[in-house]
Design a protein with these regions (language model features):
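Amphipathic, heptad-repeat alpha-helical segments used for oligomerization and assembly
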Residues: 258, 262, 267-271, 353-363
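Glycine-rich, aromatic-lined ligand/substrate-binding cores of catalytic
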Residues: 271-302
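Conserved active-site-proximal loop/helix segments of enzymes involved in bacterial cell-wall
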Residues: 123-125, 260-262, 308-310
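Extracellular/periplasmic, surface-exposed regions of secreted and cell-surface proteins
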Residues: 1-201, 355-435
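Extracytoplasmic gating/loop element in the C-terminal half of outer-membrane beta-barrel translocons
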Residues: 4, 243, 297-391, 396
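Single conserved hydrophobic/aromatic residue that forms the stacking wall/gate
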Residues: 433, 440-442
Length: 442
């Protein structure tokens, strides 16, 4: 049991116990003489850790100066006090097994874990009438459950050639187990992109919240009568009710009230991968060595906000200052209506700032992380040169990836678990290459 104290919180002290138990079955009589099995160990562990990552003096309110019209200075509350902050607590249970056979040539490690994070420290968005945009508080509970497998093997080993391989598979499901608000949903505070994410009780971390894009308004749809939720025509056209013209973006009016507003929003995607894997291989043939490492992330969405920004910069028909996008060539026109790209229309309402399914893409990808080729000079040659060792190698990092995502790099969107999967001008992971040699002299 450990006790941690922090002057950053009102409740300074918190206690965090931990315990672990393992049973090495290989040491038991019924397996000790088994030559096929090298290792068989069962593990059980529990641990609790805390988090107090808030800035110093955050429990106190903060004043900021305001310049008055008469030249005097007054002060306002810029940040409210957070006097009741306490430790965020993370409790985790882990069950695992270690297994090895064939004199260590094949090894398996498997783990199941259940992690519960309570009293999460979060900046939560506040309504306008509160006088400040956000409030730091302990709010909600997050649960992460997952499994991890690692298989290591030496498939071929002899005097001249050997191959070692490691394969890792992982699945994690992070959900909001509890959101203590009347509707069990909460908006994160912070920058504009955080408005894309909602913390919804029972839903996964990284859930996108927005509107459902339904294509482009066509001339006949604009002029068609509006049908309300009861299936009745109101006598007005869709164009009149929604304030649109042909060529504008169309969004689904969920409650059929004739308005596109927050009541029509819903879950439109999730940036949390369902599973990921990594495969590392190293080969040695005489004095040559070759290795590569490849990873994959699957079953998640990316919100391509970079693409949305490009479209959103267009005001009416003004495109000055905008780098032309190839998509513009496919925009709606009266003679080109079979498209999902809005037209340069004069009039109507183009809701450019809407987060919607229009910019949600499949983010799954496979990426080659590294490739290395090397050669080690033979011992006799090194002695002739008066050195003990010389290895020359070339290495490439992140040379390519395979994905259907239209942005630059899907891996660059994988940030914080709470706000993952959004490409807001994300800088791609760098491609690098290196040529070098290692020398050890006597």
């Amino acid at each position: 049991i450990r006790a941690d104290g922090s002057s950053r919180l009102k409740d300074k002290w918190c206690y965090f116990p931990s315990a672990a138990l393992a049973w090495d079955l290989k040491q038991e009589n019924f397996l000790k003489e088994n030559s096929f099995i090298d290792q068989l160990k069962l593990r059980l562990g529990y641990g609790s850790v805390g988090n107090q990552s808030v800035e110093a003096y955050r429990i106190y309110s903060k004043m900021s100066p305001v310049r008055n019209s008469d030249g005097s200075t007054s002060y306002k509350v810029d940040r409210p006090a957070a006097p009741y902050l306490k430790w965020e607590r993370n409790d985790q249970v882990n069950v695992g097994i270690d297994f090895g056979i064939l004199n260590g040539r094949v090894r398996l490690t498997a783990d199941w874990y259940n992690k519960v994070s309570k009293d999460i420290l979060l900046e939560l968005a506040q309504p306008t009438h509160m006088g400040y945009s956000s409030l730091l508080m302990n709010s909600g509970e997050i649960k992460n459950t997952g499994v991890e497998f690692t298989i290591s093997a030496d498939p071929f080993t002899n005097k001249d050639f050997n191959w070692h391989t490691d394969l890792t598979l992982a699945h994690n499901k992070g959900t909001y187990a509890s959101i203590p608000t009347p509707n069990h949903r909460q908006q994160q505070a912070g920058n504009y992109q955080n408005q894309l994410f909602q913390m919804i009780e029972g839903e996964k971390l990284g859930t996108f919240w927005g509107y459902t894009f339904d294509g482009i308004w066509q001339e006949d749809e604009v002029n068609a009568p509006f049908i309300d939720a009861n299936g009745n025509a109101t006598g007005e056209t869709n164009g009149k009710v929604y304030g649109v013209v042909a060529g504008n973006s169309k969004y689904i009016d969920v409650n059929k009230d004739g308005k596109i507003n927050t009541e029509d929003q819903g879950i439109i995607g999730c940036g949390q991968p369902t599973f990921n894997w990594g495969w590392n291989n190293s080969f040695n043939y005489k004095n040559f060595d070759f290795s590569f490492f490849v990873v994959g992330f699957h079953g998640f969405d990316i919100y391509n906000a970079t693409k949305q920004i490009g479209f959103g910069l267009i005001g009416s028909q003004q495109v000055a200052g905008v780098t032309p996008m190839r998509d513009f060539l496919d925009r709606w026109t009266p003679t080109h209506t079979n498209t999902n790209v809005p037209g340069f229309t004069n009039g109507g309402t183009e809701n450019k700032d809407f987060f919607s399914t229009r910019f949600v893409e499949n983010g799954s990808f496979i990426k080659m992380k590294s490739i290395t080729l090397g050669y080690t000079l033979p011992e006799l040659a090194c002695k002739a040169l008066g050195i003990s060792n010389l290895r020359v190698y070339a290495s490439i990092q992140n040379p390519f990836h395979i994905t259907s995502y239209s942005g630059l790099d899907p891996e660059a969107t994988m940030g914080s678990p709470l706000v993952q999967g959004v490409d807001w001008g994300a800088y791609p992971v760098s491609y690098t290459h290196l040529r070098a040699h290692e020398t050890l002299r006597h």
